[in-house]
Amino acid sequence: MRKAIISLWVVLVGVLGVSAQSGKSVSILGDSYSTFQGYVQPETNVVWYWDSPDAQNTDVHSVRETWWHQFILKNGYRLCLNNSFSGSTVCNSGYKRGNPDFADYTDRSFVTRMTNLGCPDIIFIFGGTNDAWAGSPIGEYKYGGWTKEDLFSFRPAMAKMLDFMINRYPNVEIYFILNDGLQEEINESVKTICGHYQIPCIVLDGIDKINGHPSIKGMTQICEQVETFLSGR
């Protein structure tokens, strides 16, 4: 009898342990839209969303209001790593800010940070917005043999990033989230390159924003549109 009780206890502990760990883990490679104070890695990454925000910039004041936290919480997932950096571009060319040349964003670009996403089950890449806003060079479609110079243009940097990620993160679900309201050249480039690498592209629509960034309502819309896309697969 005692052996039977012990065996049952071992089985229950094992089942509960598996259940507790069964939720998929999620990593985010993003820009300001996916930041929140205290929830990005490395901690030195610049953030847009704070727990005491400027009301002129946003009405988001809790991490629970961000699109990714809502998505993770609603689906029983776990956060692996959020490597988002406000103002970051996919390529290495950043904002001119009154200067004649593009700023060198190699220290914060997606194509640099793509190596640091942990070991997740799902990765969301949410970028391209700052490349569009900064007017970064669009470049040509190029699917191999990238040079350092190539990575200062959007198309080759985007291709390099996806090529690297499907090899660095095998058997991981990778999705690209495309913001609404961007130039058609960026939209077409993202869809074409995602198609080449067979990366699903979630195209957002009608996102509510304050100062160009998702509001609380917009964050919920993003979460819902991501969920709708995934449920249809």
Regions found by a protein language model. Name each.
Residues 22, 101-233:
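Alpha-helical cap/lid subdomain in secreted, periplasmic
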Residues 11-14, 20, 27, 84, ...:
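Generic detector of intrinsically disordered, low-complexity, polar/charged segments
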Residues 1-63, 72-74, 116-118, 170, ...:
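N-terminal secretory targeting modules
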Residues 30-32, 84, 180:
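A mature extracytoplasmic/lumenal domain signature
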Residues 34-36, 91, 132, 222:
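Short, electropositive, low-hydrophobicity segments enriched in small/polar residues
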